[in-house]
């Protein structure tokens, strides 16, 4: 009976793995603080000025000039940041986590993206973005960088590490570059400015980091229960 309880507790604990290893939690907290700071600084600047900032004046023309040579890309890249594709990619991440029994990862993917998109569309845009026609932060950038950040969190410390570290790093960089490409395409077609894209990236990544740290905290509490129960029963 005792052995069965220990086996059950071990299986449950393996399914409730922490998303971020210990040394990376402090780094995640620092990155989260940076994302919050960037969002606040850009938001305050936008509210206090109706004119384009020096960042937009410096980067927007360069981005548009660089990407104007690729009209085909500009036709389909922005579509990936719309609600439908973002929802499908989110469901794919949730399904992958469920198949591999990464319950914490499934919770992260299921909640972080909707929270990030909802924060952008229903809180930040109506309040901060109202000064510039509700363009800040970019919803496309928010969704894509949230997905990229989730990929990074899921691949940083997978359960069995069957995928080599170099391949995992390449996958994360690919996800980040794809997010950058979608955000840049929105700037190139004039739908957003560089500031909007940076703000969306900060919101998307920041929400994912906040959710990952919260999920890990809850997971740690849940893992303590099964570990302590057999000892108390004996």
Annotate each PLM feature.
Residues 1-85, 125-129:
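N-terminal transmembrane-helix/juxtamembrane module of multi-pass inner/ER membrane proteins
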Residues 107-135:
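Hydrophobic alpha-helical transmembrane segments of integral membrane proteins
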């Amino acid at each position: 009976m005792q052995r069965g309880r220990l086996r059950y507790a071990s299986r449950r604990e393996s399914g409730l793995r922490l998303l971020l290893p210990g040394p990376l939690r402090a780094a995640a907290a620092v990155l989260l603080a940076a994302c919050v700071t960037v969002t606040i600084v850009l938001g305050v600047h936008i509210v206090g000025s109706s004119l384009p900032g020096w960042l937009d004046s410096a980067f927007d023309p360069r981005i548009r000039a660089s990407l104007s040579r690729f009209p085909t890309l500009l036709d389909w890249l922005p579509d990936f940041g719309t609600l439908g594709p973002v929802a499908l990619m989110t469901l794919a991440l949730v399904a992958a986590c469920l198949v591999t029994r990464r319950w914490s990862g499934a919770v992260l993917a299921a909640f972080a993206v909707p929270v990030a998109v909802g924060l952008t569309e229903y809180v930040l845009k109506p309040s901060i973005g109202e000064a510039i026609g509700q363009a800040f932060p970019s919803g496309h950038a928010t969704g894509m960088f949230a997905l990229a950040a989730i990929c990074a969190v899921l691949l940083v410390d997978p359960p069995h590490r069957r995928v080599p570290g170099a391949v995992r790093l390449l996958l994360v960089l690919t996800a980040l570059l794809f997010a950058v490409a979608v955000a840049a395409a929105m700037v190139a077609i004039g739908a957003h400015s560089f500031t909007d894209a940076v703000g969306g990236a900060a919101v998307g990544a920041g929400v994912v980091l906040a959710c990952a740290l919260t999920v890990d905290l809850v997971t740690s509490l849940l893992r303590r229960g099964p570990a302590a129960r057999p000892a108390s029963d004996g």
